[in-house]
Amino acid sequence: MPKPLIIFKDFSFQYYSQQTPTLNQINLTIYEGQKVLIVGKNGSGKSTFLKCINGLIPHSYQGKITGTAIIKDKVLTQTNIFDLSLDVGTIMQDTDNQFVGLTVAEDIAFALENDDLPQSEIYQKVNMWAQDLGLQSFLDYKPQELSEGHKQLASMAGVLIYNPSILLFDESLSNLDPVSRAKMTALIKTIHQKYHSTILVIEHYLEDILDDSFDRVIVFEDEKIIYDNSPQKLILENILTKQGIQEPTYISALKKVGINLGSLPYLLNLPALQSLDFVQYFSNQLTNLKKCAISQNDPTQLLPFFPKQFAPFCPILQLQNISYHYESKQPNILNDISLDLFPGKMISIVGKNGSGKSTLAKVICGFSNPQTGTILLNNQDLTHLSLQQRSEKIGFVMQNPHHMISQKTVFEEVALGLLGKQLSLTEIKTKVHAILKTCNLDCFVNRPISALSFGQKKRLTIASILVMQPQILILDEPTIGQDLKHHTQIMTFLQKLNNKGITIIIITHDMSLMLNYTQRTLVLEQGKIIANTTPLKIFTDMSLMQKTSLNPISLIVLINKLPFTSEQKNVLLTQMLAFLKEDCCYGK
């Protein structure tokens, strides 16, 4: 029988800065070699739970503990964080907190150097993990020079290289491009099978991770565990839907066409579902579905729920021959980019990690100055504007909220940008409270920012930019770390802004977001724009998707197996997305 490895008995934890517990009466045993998925709404206690396993609580985050937690025979409150780290490896949500080396290679090698391994062995292992994670060409880079996605991979390599018996992944797949995410999901499976590691994974985005390889799924709600059972039962009992957690799109589609999920022996094994018998049954069910969302004469037209379009008389933003590199010895991050963006559009920018997406946004906003090229806003050259002047016209919400936050409380952070605008305190309070309510943060108005979850901090940074009412809003992965409720609130709010004429640019790895909310997609590859078209056309260009590390959502994977023509598949996909959106099964 497997050995109990992680034991929580009547365990509660309350941060000193909060009035109520973040974990309340947790009773749980995780056995050696189990692979566990942990889900729940923002602020439900998931990340705090992992911090109690790796020792960050109580050693780095103080608070009141009652009950008992035992990690690999070590009592949590009686064991120092170093001893726990020998058994527990954590890949954090915020990778910048993990780097200790001056270069990526040094950072990956850090744990092995502490163990005084021979240099030849260290070199061999560093190169092996760098190759497995696609980091070979970045070993000499400073960690701070990497894209957020490559930072995530580097931090993973630094943990995986010393093979701890317990591995914790705290939203660690969220910054990865779709192909890298799929590779990392496969790597986690391989590590679990090869080393029999005990693995705990926290994820909000279940599209390509929820499958039958997990032994258990644990659901947190209001600081308690409300579900601890198999992933199959999770779907059959509609636990995700009840909790407002987005289920994989193909699951929503199966429900929509009336398929009895309990009759499917391989419900969470998508490749097995693609058998001929099932495909034929799915096809018949779709044929019987009488609704029609679009004209079949134009299968690639925009989905009907897109916002009102504004007449593009002239571009609002023009990029002319923009090139940029960080240091002269390094190749260009952006290569001779020229682009016209029109007012009132919601645009997505996609591409593999390191393709130049975030750098392009920083150049537009003035955080980085291009070596060549011109940027025009409403035909005005932005070169001579100060960073403050440009920020009043173009708002930028960074991927990592910790790179933006500078104040102690929620109110102070949102009010900061308004202080120089000659507004009365009453006017400032009115604007701050209104935007906090929109972002579902009004109940935290006087709370210290340090007490917020990562997802709540993300919404806070969005609020701090939106309160300035910019003409163009650029968001780098705005929904990372958000549960379905807050994901939908953010995107619905962005749609309302877009309907008012604000041009919105979203950098994302979320293919569902791209397909459901944006009217146009730019695809970057090695610092160049190689596609500028509608999201649906991106998904029908398989060579483009393979070249740029874009993976189709699970619904598309399923539809591609149907015995239809390409045009029929495009019509079907558009219909299904409209149906799911309409019935609130998906994206709401």
Curated annotation (Swiss-Prot):
ATP 1 binds at G40, K41, N42, G43, S44, G45, K46, S47. Keywords: ATP-binding, Cell membrane, Membrane, Nucleotide-binding, Repeat, Translocase, Transport. One of its GO terms (cellular component) is ATP-binding cassette (ABC) transporter complex. It is a peripheral membrane protein. Residues 6-247, 317-551 form the ABC transporter domain. NCBIfam families: PRK13648.1. Probably part of an ABC transporter complex. Responsible for energy coupling to the transport system. This is Putative ABC transporter ATP-binding protein PAM_020. It comes from Onion yellows phytoplasma (strain OY-M).
